[in-house]
Amino acid sequence: MTRIKRGYIARRRRTKLRLFASSFRGAHSRLTRTMTQQRIRALVSAHRDRGKRKRDFRRLWITRINAVIHEMGVFYSYNEFIHNLYKKQLLLNRKILAQIALLNRSCLYTISNDIKK
């Protein structure tokens, strides 16, 4: 039987893994088996938190819009504001509205007064 030389393929795979896990602490950056486990865990966390980041930012935008609207008047709520926006067919998403609320409140006041009518 001929001798099988399998030199660099496994080494190349482990080197890639080592580069990925080089910033991990302790054995998680030294031992191959724990490196693979931590790599899977890191990728799972990254995938989960990409979705969570979208939810968190949407919640932040809604909170900012709601805070500025409540300063304007007590009887006007966030959901009425969004409902009136859709009724008037204004294409402003929550991210843009939050930026307007943060940087230019008078502009948001005029928008809300226009859609109230």
Swiss-Prot record:
Keyword terms of this UniProt record: Chloroplast, Plastid, Ribonucleoprotein, Ribosomal protein, RNA-binding, rRNA-binding
GO biological process: ribosomal large subunit assembly; translation
GO molecular function: mRNA binding; rRNA binding; structural constituent of ribosome
Domain of life the protein comes from: Eukaryota
Keyword Ribosomal protein: yes
Protein name (database record): Large ribosomal subunit protein bL20c
Underlying gene: rpl20
Family: Belongs to the bacterial ribosomal protein bL20 family.
Organism: Arabidopsis thaliana
Localization: Plastid, Chloroplast
Pfam families in the record: Ribosomal_L20 (PF00453)
Function description: Binds directly to 23S ribosomal RNA and is necessary for the in vitro assembly process of the 50S ribosomal subunit. It is not involved in the protein synthesizing functions of that subunit.
InterPro entries: Ribosomal_bL20, RIBOSOMAL_L20_CS, Ribosomal_protein_bL20_C
Keyword rRNA-binding part of the UniProt annotation: yes
Cellular component GO terms held in the UniProt record: chloroplast; chloroplast envelope; chloroplast stroma; plastid; ribonucleoprotein complex; ribosome
